[in-house]
């Protein structure tokens, strides 16, 4: 009976929502849906397109365990200026060469379809840890757009440590700092773990906001086996 009363009370409170509140909520939902629907628009232009003259793919890797799969693309900015919002289209294939995943999907998060920023001459290991493969991932290919030019810091300082690890992954916790005078929103922290030149684990976290001249906590899960590996963390600025 108590549970029923709680449920009724919740419904009653929900019914008190004003028309203005309902309108504002519907507007937020509509904007969010439009944002997600448009997320794959830049990728459509990359299908069958020649490689970018500004951003080069230096290598690709894929790791997978029973916990999931992650694709990693090593990219480099060959220009003398910072590039922002660089579209990236990836396709993951199995050992037989059949496509098992692509990030060119309506509704996918923008953080999984673009590189936030790359400093002049800089490089980054971009991670997609949401690979919903229909088969066993074996390889990944990538096509990049040119992005937009602009300024900003090369990278946001990141401090972190691995709090837990196993053969199936590891948990990384830390802080990302924003030394600029403007808040950074939707900051992606990329994490890759290597044994020498071999990628053995990867993951990422999205921080809603890092305040101006402040810092924010993050936690991410590594896919793969990070045991004894060298961990690299990068957080490109978003503005």
Model-derived segments and spans:
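Membrane engagement elements in two modes
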Residues: 9, 16-173, 177-185, 194-239
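Extended Gly/Ser/Thr-rich low-complexity repeat segments
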Residues: 187-189
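Sec-dependent bacterial lipoprotein signal peptides
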Residues: 1-14
């Amino acid at each position: 009976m108590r549970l029923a009363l709680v449920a009724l009370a919740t419904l009653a409170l929900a019914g008190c929502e004003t028309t203005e509140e309902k309108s504002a909520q519907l507007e937020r939902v509509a904007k969010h849906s439009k944002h997600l629907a448009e997320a794959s628009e830049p990728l459509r232009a990359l299908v069958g397109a020649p490689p970018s003259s500004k951003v080069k793919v230096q290598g690709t890797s894929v790791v997978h365990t029973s916990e999931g799969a992650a694709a990693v693309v090593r990219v480099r900015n060959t220009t003398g200026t910072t590039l922002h919002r660089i579209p990236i289209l990836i396709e993951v294939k199995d050992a037989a060469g059949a496509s098992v995943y692509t990030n060119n999907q309506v509704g996918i998060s923008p953080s999984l379809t673009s590189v936030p920023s790359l400093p002049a001459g800089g490089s980054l290991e971009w991670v997609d840890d949401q690979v919903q493969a229909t088969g066993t991932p074996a390889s990944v290919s990538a096509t990049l757009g040119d992005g937009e030019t602009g300024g900003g810091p090369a990278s946001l300082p990141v401090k972190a440590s691995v709090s837990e690890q196993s053969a199936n992954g590891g948990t990384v916790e830390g802080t990302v700092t924003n030394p600029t005078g403007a808040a950074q929103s939707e900051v992606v922290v990329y994490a890759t773990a290597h044994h020498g030149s071999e990628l053995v684990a990867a993951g990422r976290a999205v921080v809603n906001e890092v305040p101006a001249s402040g810092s924010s906590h993050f936690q991410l899960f590594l896919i793969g086996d990070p045991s004894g590996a060298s961990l690299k963390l990068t957080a490109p600025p978003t503005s």
